[in-house]
Design a protein with these regions (language model features):
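Domain-level signal for soluble alpha/beta catalytic cores
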Residues: 15-414
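Basic polycationic patches enriched in arginine
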Residues: 2, 13-14
Length: 414
């Protein structure tokens, strides 16, 4: 195993990247076999989760211990991904408490607290709602729906040092691996999910809030790409908010929101080539009825206006598994790839590799080109610390099943 690289080499890489603007290798395609990836968040150790939950609840925690545990967890999940057959992997989001809430530590303007509305499908089924509430009450976790901060002042990115350190830690870990990823990726949230989940109590209107968020997130997006990583923007808002914020409003109102967010994302990506970005969209990472979800065919036409090189969409869960057919009618742009969810992160069922292969092949038939399809997971395994449902050893078994399924599909497709 190679020694971990020193800070000088990291700084040299960063300087090289900056000097070359935002160029770099084109996003990987499945040139001679189906590649594998996932959506970002991976199971966190119990003690790390406890510290994140305590801090999120307003309790004082040992920040040095938290940082150490986060780095240790990241150093563990990277080789686990490699051993499980992941080609395009990341840091597991171990150094963040949740996929979007971490921005409150990197941006000004957030404070106070509020609670989000309840999902329409959760309200619809009282028995399920009671069961879910009991399960959450018994879990040590960071909530991404309750006691959330609000925008109470001007939102600005405070200091890129935090995201640079997170990128550097990931790079150090990658350099220590005998065999690394074919391509590393790094996640950051959509301005839309922050605008929806972290209530605007400062700006005159939603667009002004989105503009401020887009400008702040541009710092993070550009730093990630400058550091040599593929950027994944996590945007559940572009589907999920239909049955959350917009559950009592016309579909047209929701689609206008999607258009506003996509426009904001595009402006935030103005300096980044589209082939260095993929956009992850889903209907909410919870095991619920999901019978209030907006159909993919309604939102995909707007998503195709995003200036990104790939879309990451869920096709493994039983509510949306059929929607790969939408790709037959609403085709991707010629330069775009699709990361197709073929693994469900909300169940302990380990998908049979043949099932995975069949799911991959269905999407390939819809798209018409195996080189533009990558196998993935519907969503993260622990999008908010402690909320993950699948035990970590089963997570790695599911990843391995995906890799084997990709090999089976590749033998039939190439």
């Amino acid at each position: 195993m190679r020694a971990v690289c020193g800070i000088d080499s990291v700084l040299a890489r960063r300087k090289h990247s900056i000097n070359n603007a935002f160029g770099g290798d084109t996003m990987l395609h499945s040139r001679d076999r189906i590649l594998t990836t996932h959506c970002g968040s991976l199971p966190r150790p119990a003690e790390l989760t406890r510290l994140y939950a305590d801090r999120s609840a307003g309790k004082s925690v040992d920040e040095a211990a938290l940082a150490t545990l986060g780095k240790q967890a990241m150093n563990w999940v990277v080789p686990q991904q490699i051993a499980s057959g992941i080609d395009i992997g990341n840091n597991g989001e171990q150094q963040r408490e949740a996929f979007f809430l971490y921005v409150r530590h990197r941006m000004s303007g957030f404070g106070g607290a509020w609670n989000r509305r309840i999902f329409a499908d959760v309200t619809k089924y009282a028995g399920y709602r009671a069961q879910q509430a009991a399960a959450h009450a018994a879990t040590v976790a960071v909530s991404n729906t309750g006691t959330l901060p609000q925008a109470i002042g001007a939102v600005k990115y405070l200091d890129r040092a935090m995201v640079e350190a997170e990128c550097d830690d990931f790079r150090f870990c990658l350099d220590a691996q005998e065999n690394g990823f074919a391509e590393p990726f790094f996640t950051a949230p959509s301005p839309g999910i922050i605008a929806a989940a972290m209530l605007n109590a400062f700006y005159d209107n939603e667009q002004a809030y989105l503009d401020a968020l887009g400008e702040a997130l541009r710092v993070e997006y550009e730093t990630i790409v400058r550091s040599g990583f593929l950027l994944q923007i996590d945007a559940p808002d572009l589907a999920m908010e239909r049955h959350l914020t917009y559950q009592d409003r016309p579909l047209s109102d929701f689609l206008e929101f999607v258009e506003r967010v996509v426009g904001t994302i595009n402006r935030a990506l103005v300096n980044i080539p589209r082939d260095r970005v993929r956009l992850h969209v889903c209907w909410g990472n919870y095991e619920g009825p999901h019978d209030c979800d907006v159909p993919l065919q309604d939102v995909l036409p707007v998503l195709l206006h995003a200036n990104v090189g790939g879309l990451v969409l869920p096709f493994a869960n039983p509510r949306h598994a059929h929607e790969y057919h939408v790709l037959e009618k609403l085709t991707l742009h010629p330069d775009q790839i699709i990361v197709a969810g073929v693994i469900d992160p909300l169940t302990h069922f380990i998908e049979h590799p043949e099932v995975v292969a069949e799911r991959i092949e269905r999407v390939v038939r819809a798209v018409g080109d195996p080189t533009r399809v990558i196998a993935g997971v519907d969503c993260g395994f622990d999008t908010s610390a402690g909320r993950g449902k699948v035990a970590d050893d089963v997570v790695w078994a599911k990843m391995s099943a995906m890799a084997e399924g990709a090999r089976i599909a590749s033998a039939r497709l190439f």
